UniProtKB/Swiss-Prot annotation:
Alphabetic keyword roster: ATP synthesis, Cell membrane, CF(1), Hydrogen ion transport, Ion transport, Membrane, Transport
Pfam families the UniProt entry points to: OSCP
Gene name tied to this protein: atpH
Source taxon at top rank: Bacteria
InterPro entries, per the entry: ATP_synth_OSCP/delta_N_sf, ATPase_OSCP/dsu
Entry coiled-coil feature ranges: none
Membrane topology: Peripheral membrane protein
Organism: Levilactobacillus brevis (strain ATCC 367 / BCRC 12310 / CIP 105137 / JCM 1170 / LMG 11437 / NCIMB 947 / NCTC 947) (Lactobacillus brevis)
Compartment(s) where it occurs, according to its Swiss-Prot or TrEMBL record: Cell membrane
Protein name per its UniProtKB record: ATP synthase subunit delta
Amino acid sequence: MSLNRATVAKRYSQALFDLLSEKDQLESGYTELQELRRIFQDNPQLSTMLSDASLQVADREALLQPLLKQASPYIKNLIQMVYDYGRMENMVDIIDQFQVLYDELHHTVYAEVTTAVELSAEQKSQIEAVYAKRVGAEKVVLSSKVDPDVIGGVIVKAADTILDGSLRTKINRLRQQLLA
């Protein structure tokens, strides 16, 4: 039975998360995994090449060695195990799932805020603080998007939650009430 990508990512990331937590190396492991993610994102063919059975084993291992060389023992073991089981194409998924676990532990929420005009740093900070309080997060990481159709106000989207305080939505609601 073949496991799907999400299942593989959850299993490997949970095992690594538990191990790093137990060994009090969660922060350093997290930092290392972020760097590993950047390597795979900067070299999109790397995971495919490391999984490519048509390449000689020596060639694949030559690609693998720099990753292992700079890794701490637990991350090195993860990389080696993922490679040995032919799951290198799942590496970024594993790191992404680890990020989810890490963010849950640290009560970090990622949100996108949409406004009609560019927000200042102060406005972003205010939105982060208000939203963090509303959802019980310790930290909110905002990305912002400008959409003139919003007219005014803000729309905040995070995971499965949308808070729409835009003028566009208020006008549409008023229109619906007037037409009813």
